[in-house]
């Protein structure tokens, strides 16, 4: 082989090897950094832009795509200990001309965390209302989506600020009394009885506990490498003290059944999406909401757990779009009549 040709292959091989070795080193040595880069890249690929806005001295962090148009804007509220990027799997399947806003909930990720703040469900709903006013999202009624803790907040928000919300999607929301005890609720009861409340299953501090949490939250069994589990834990550990405080706040008597206490006040057309195999919040909550909210549409997803957004992103996105089309069509018919 000609020496110049051989040198070309060596140089090309070396050029390819450098990013591969960098990736392997990051995977083995800095998995948490790799996870952050992953979210950064995914946001860019989907066209989501990150912005900050302040209400007095309180800062909100959010991502958005598109501009307000003839269809309602969509505001998405994530669950306990998550962040705005958890919605990216659904954003992938939503039209680019829809105006989407994903906000970090109070105390999470880039939104202000303060020991003096009120992290009860009603307190969080007030903060989200401040955010909505800051970005003037409520110039027109918008579609509100929330999952788990975010679903609890979304339902309370729709009840307390009905003029802001034209329609509502609640994905396996918290805030309802349990008619059937889920695996998670049973674990909590056992921890309370043994006085080991610090070992909350949703607040892992080791890769093994992270694997257990993923099994609890998901019906689909994802094969997650040990290093990624370690990275997921490393990202969360600095925040675990806050997560414990927040968890005790939202399961306190003031917030535990907030959605149940407010569901009869919800006037907006409402969509309920729930995984049939949810082990965190029992699926029986769907029928409870359906019996209290006048215009309520329930969708139970087979072979799906609590992490609906991760397990069934395409289906969830399609259900939201179909529901919006139904509500939008109904509104147009009323105007024409």
Q: What feature does the model see in each segment?
A:
Residues 31-33, 179-186, 201-265:
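Conserved alpha/beta-hydrolase catalytic His-Asp/Glu region
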Residues 155, 159-160, 164-205:
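Flexible "cap/lid" loop of the alpha/beta hydrolase fold
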Residues 3-4, 295-337:
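Catalytic active-site module of serine/aspartate enzymes centered on a nucleophile-bearing elbow/loop
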Residues 64-110:
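Conserved HGGG/HGGXW glycine-rich cap/lid loop of the alpha/beta-hydrolase fold
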Residues 1-74, 96-98, 133, 137, ...:
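Alpha/beta-hydrolase fold catalytic core
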Residues 55, 63-64, 101-145, 161, ...:
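Active-site loop/oxyanion-hole signature of alpha/beta-hydrolase fold enzymes
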Residues 266, 272-274, 278:
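Short beta-strand/loop motif that positions the catalytic acidic residue
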